Amino acid sequence: MSSLAGFRNLATKIVCVGRNYKDHALELGNAIPKKPMLFVKTVNSFIVEGEPIVAPPGCQNLHQEVELGVVISKKASRISKSDAMDYIGGYTVALDMTARDFQDEAKKAGAPWFLAKSFDGSCPIGGFLPVSDIPNPHDVELFCKINGKDQQRCRTDVMIFDIPTLLEYTTQFFTLEVGDVVLTGTPAGVTKINSGDVIEFGLTDKLNSKFNVQ
């Protein structure tokens, strides 16, 4: 499992789950989903501490979304909920950076969200925590601070779809490879970020990352 500390170099994709916290869905005026909503970021989305967050060209409304990430430890295809936790090697925390103006335009046109979600650098990501450090991923606290002030803070027990459900559903449609990351959704509190902002995020008492916005 220790080899998964370098999961960013192993990953083939980042699977993201939309609207998995009721309060976030409602703050954007969206319906509560009846099944998981999935989209994918490319691995070029990853950036690490020391690299700046940069809005894509033309974006005027860039939002942050803090999310618990699940790191896959072995190839997973059409797995069951009862076995799903056996495919997890550890956890991380990331920001799903979203060009909200791009996304709003795509929604109106009935088009995919790809440009809004998967631009280069759209996934600032923290370090790796082995499963032994998080015995219950549904009982940790996500946080995100902007310029030192709380912007998002929520426990993971209020997810609409829990992690086994997400992994079972995802792997019915496509295979998860070793090192792939599944981002499990964001709570309420997303907001526009600006050049010069400092974003700090992580899991309370477990993991902390800090990024500057260019």
UniProtKB/Swiss-Prot annotation:
Molecular function terms, GO-annotated: acetylpyruvate hydrolase activity; metal ion binding; oxaloacetate tautomerase activity
Keyword terms: Isomerase, Magnesium, Metal-binding, Mitochondrion
Protein residues bound to Mg(2+): E65, E67, D96
Keyword Metal-binding: yes
Cofactor binding, note field: Requires a divalent metal cation for activity.
GO BP term, pick one: oxaloacetate metabolic process
Enzyme Commission identifier(s): 5.3.2.2
Cofactor(s) in the UniProt record: Mg(2+); Mn(2+)
Expressed in which tissues: Widely expressed.
Principal subcellular localisation of the protein: mitochondrion
Pfam family, one: FAA_hydrolase
Protein location: Mitochondrion
Recorded GO CC terms: mitochondrion
Catalytic activity, as annotated: oxaloacetate = enol-oxaloacetate
Reported function: Tautomerase that converts enol-oxaloacetate, a strong inhibitor of succinate dehydrogenase, to the physiological keto form of oxaloacetate.
Family: Belongs to the FAH family.
Name of the featured protein: Oxaloacetate tautomerase fahd-1, mitochondrial
Biological classification of the source: Eukaryota, Metazoa, Ecdysozoa, Nematoda, Chromadorea
